[in-house]
């Protein structure tokens, strides 16, 4: 399902006071700054095999929310995984953790928000959970929610 991106500040003005906005100051790394879509979730710690597997499937405009427990020790997304997301029709990836290949990520047509960068790559054991509620930045992301992202932040709406 494709969702039209919207300015988060305008969206907040419309739905206030029932606002769910992420308090983390995630940075933009992808080629798209404004993106939106239905939420798919994954929880993984310093291991990106599961999220690589998910992003290798058709995204149909969805946003993958990755709870990496805020770890900046290893990157969960780099240019290869971001390329998979773009090639498979994902609108974006929100990472509560680190990314790498920051210069290359800016050239890939997918939204990417993350805490920061680290050139160290993650392990590839496949550990983690998919399609579970994940919480960070004062927001609980539930599969099927709609995430709207832009320069001002992230707003989550339950359809």
From Swiss-Prot:
Homotrimer. InterPro entries: RraA, RraA/RraA-like, RraA/RraA-like_sf. The gene is rraA. This is Putative 4-hydroxy-4-methyl-2-oxoglutarate aldolase. It comes from Mycolicibacterium smegmatis (strain ATCC 700084 / mc(2)155) (Mycobacterium smegmatis). GO terms for biological process: regulation of RNA metabolic process. Keywords: Lyase, Metal-binding. Its cofactor is a divalent metal cation. Divalent metal cation. It catalyses: 4-hydroxy-4-methyl-2-oxoglutarate = 2 pyruvate; oxaloacetate + H(+) = pyruvate + CO2. A divalent metal cation binds at residue 101. Its EC number is 4.1.3.17, 4.1.1.112. It holds the Pfam family RraA-like. Belongs to the class II aldolase/RraA-like family. Catalyzes the aldol cleavage of 4-hydroxy-4-methyl-2-oxoglutarate (HMG) into 2 molecules of pyruvate. Also contains a secondary oxaloacetate (OAA) decarboxylase activity due to the common pyruvate enolate transition state formed following C-C bond cleavage in the retro-aldol and decarboxylation reactions. GO terms for molecular function: 4-hydroxy-4-methyl-2-oxoglutarate aldolase activity; metal ion binding; oxaloacetate decarboxylase activity; ribonuclease inhibitor activity. The keyword Metal-binding applies. The keyword Lyase applies.
């Amino acid at each position: 399902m494709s969702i039209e991106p919207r300015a988060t500040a305008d969206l907040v003005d419309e739905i206030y006071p029932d606002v769910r906005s992420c308090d983390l100051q995630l940075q933009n790394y992808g080629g798209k700054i404004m993106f939106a879509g239905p939420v798919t979730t994954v929880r993984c710690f310093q291991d990106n095999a599961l999220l690589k597997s998910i992003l290798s499937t058709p995204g149909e405009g969805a946003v993958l929310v990755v709870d990496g427990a805020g770890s900046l020790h290893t990157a969960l997304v780099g240019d290869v995984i971001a390329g998979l997301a773009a090639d498979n029709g994902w609108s974006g990836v929100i990472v509560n953790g680190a990314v790498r290949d920051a210069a290359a990520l800016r050239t890939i047509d997918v939204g990417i928000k993350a805490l920061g960068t680290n050139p160290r790559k993650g392990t590839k054991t496949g550990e983690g959970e998919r399609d579970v509620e994940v919480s960070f930045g004062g927001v609980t992301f539930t599969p099927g929610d709609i995430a709207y992202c832009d320069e001002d932040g992230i707003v989550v709406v339950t359809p």
